[in-house]
Amino acid sequence: MKFVINTSIACWLLAWPCFAQSPESDTLRIQQLRTVEVRTSRPGEVHSLPDQQGTYLMAGRRTELIRLADTDADVAQKNPRQLLARVPGVFIYDMDGSGNQINVATRGLDAHRSWEMNMRYNGVLTNSDMYGYPASHFSPPGESLERIEMVRGTASLQYGAQFGGMLNMVSKQADTTRRFSFESIASIGSYGLRSTYNAVGGRVGKLTYYGYAYWRHADGYRQNSQSDAQALFASLRYQASSRLSISAELARSTYVYHIPGPLTDSMFRADPRQATRTRNYFSPDIWVPSVRADWQLSNQTRLQLITSAVLGVRNSVLIDAFATVPDVPDAVTGQYRQRQVDSDHFNSFTTEARLLHQFQLAGMATTAVVGGQLMHNDLHRQQLGKGTTGSDYDMTLTAPFGRDLWYYTRNGAFFAEMQLKVTPRLTLSPGIRFEHGLTRMRGVITNYDPGNLPNDIRHQFVLLGISGQYRVNEALRLYGGISQAYRPVIFKDIIPASTYEQVDKNLRDANGYNAELGVEGRWKGVHVNMSLFDVLYRNRMGTLVQTGTDGQPYTFRTTIGDSRSQGVEVLLEGQVLNAGRLTVSGFTSTAFMDARYINANVSAGTENRNVTGNQVESAPRFTSRNGLTFRYRTASLTAQYSYVGMTYSDALNTPVVTANGAKGPVPAYGVWDLNATWRVTPWLHVRGSVNNLLNSQYFTKRPLFYPGPGVWSSDGRNAVLSVGIKL
């Protein structure tokens, strides 16, 4: 990275006393000094968040801070295995085509739209509906990101109760030294990729502004997998005084993805790029407005208030069937079948208040954070509508929705955490969170007895946690902690899949804990962060076979048991060679995990089967990402190899692939990537990537629901070139 420092003024001020004391001349000769250019670079290391990050307390936890400018990652396609390469154990699910949404999870959790995580953008919650559909459909462009912050679940009492922790994507900010600045990044790539990102920002008096507009098109690796994306962002911050700032932000992301459909294993082996659908589409359109106040009440006290919303819609129109069911015109009429139309309407409002205060307690330096969170969510779900027989993205109905439901949630939470400096080296952080809320489901399902629908679900938890940290010295720390967590019963859990399915009226929210114990240190340019973890997840949802009063079997949706994930996460990175202008650094980010069901039973045909000891689906035992980075002056080149072990698609651990591809093992895979960056001048940079260099054919998951059971091919070899300017 280059830093350009104009030293003219500094040299003039230093020289002034000498001129002033000269008796030989009362005139000054003015000489224009040359600009001095200082060039340096920061290694692409992952850093832990500081013990206090704004109004968050982070001591004693495993955290990661990734600055995108320090990496060579493919930002244009927001490639998560590169962006999060140095976060060990991250499971990545390829679903919506490159460049759209990031689907990630850690420690044996489900990666579907990152819904086990507390997802944020600039600290603002972006999960679509935390109690109805916690998936994050909001998808900011990679070009807009300055850094990514990840916090594991042991800190969840402060921001939510999610098992997966928090992932906060932080946007670039305005250059406050200028009234106006401009940035533009244009990208082209394989399979019709074209994108442009344009941003402006600056400061005028007490007002700081920043905004961007983004557009991207890609034809996609597979047939019928085009996507078109747009994003907008605007931010205004008013510095009312040296202690008070008020800001407002408005973010929007939307895209339309042409869904190519699932494959069977034989189809995948024959041609992983083929499609089984030509008329399936998915499109979220999400707005995230927010208002924030940061008030430094005193040198010891800080107050932060954020009011935000997630507003928008998630639409899909598709033929929902196995890969073995072709979507072809009727032999008699020549018409296609009518497509299924589904639509979720999100109206999620959140207010969060956080008060941080520093004081002495029994002679110990103490930092305390107390706060509250209020959620007011209305989710309107419309499903099983009959659409057109056409082939375009068209949400027109020809018959009413088969499901027309509302999911109302009112929830309040209070939390408190203290960071106690027991000794100059030892820190303890106990915390508590209290959740109290009610979710009400109303509406109709065609041909289903309303009396069989659960109506009200209460959420009431007291969650406890404690973390500790011991700094052996400035370069070495020991950390660990345990925190309780829970996941509310969501809309999907309580809606019967068919008239032959019933839902437990006494469903219980999932609950459990996150525990970790680790060591982090730096020694002679080597950075090591190694942690052990243990995640207990009670009340997992599933189905059992029951017998009705008429003697007929039926499917019963309920909690089917628990699971436990244990393992080790290791990050090792450091400089391998320093030969003046040429440096070579490397890293390995590796995790071993054993995630298994305990005390669990699931339905298998017409019987229930005990799955205690079976592996949790989509939880690889071994994940490793490794890379070497070569830096010469202002250019860098990174070669990365990613390996993900074999996983199962279902709790039964079905050993043999089914004919329709819906169940069976997901084979292990390895992928090579090559990325480069050249910072030509302080205002011009070029990035290039060759993803999946050896053209490996692989897939990451066999989904059991959306976008359809079966094999979903990940992208083969592809390249992208980006050029960026800053003025």
Enumerate the predicted regions with their spans.
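Structural signature of Gram-negative outer-membrane beta-barrels, strongest in the C-terminal barrel
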Residues: 241, 346, 363-367, 373-375, ...
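Membrane-embedded beta-barrel scaffold of Gram-negative outer-membrane proteins
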Residues: 294-320, 471, 477-483, 508-573, ...
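Face-selective signature of the C-terminal outer-membrane beta-barrel domain
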Residues: 242-246, 251, 285-319, 331-444, ...
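C-terminal beta-signal and adjacent terminal beta-strands/loops
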Residues: 486, 538, 584, 642-653, ...
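Extracytoplasmic beta-strand/coil segments of soluble accessory domains associated
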Residues: 53-57, 65-66, 75, 81-128
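Transmembrane beta-barrel wall of Gram-negative outer-membrane proteins
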Residues: 188-217, 222-258, 280-301, 433
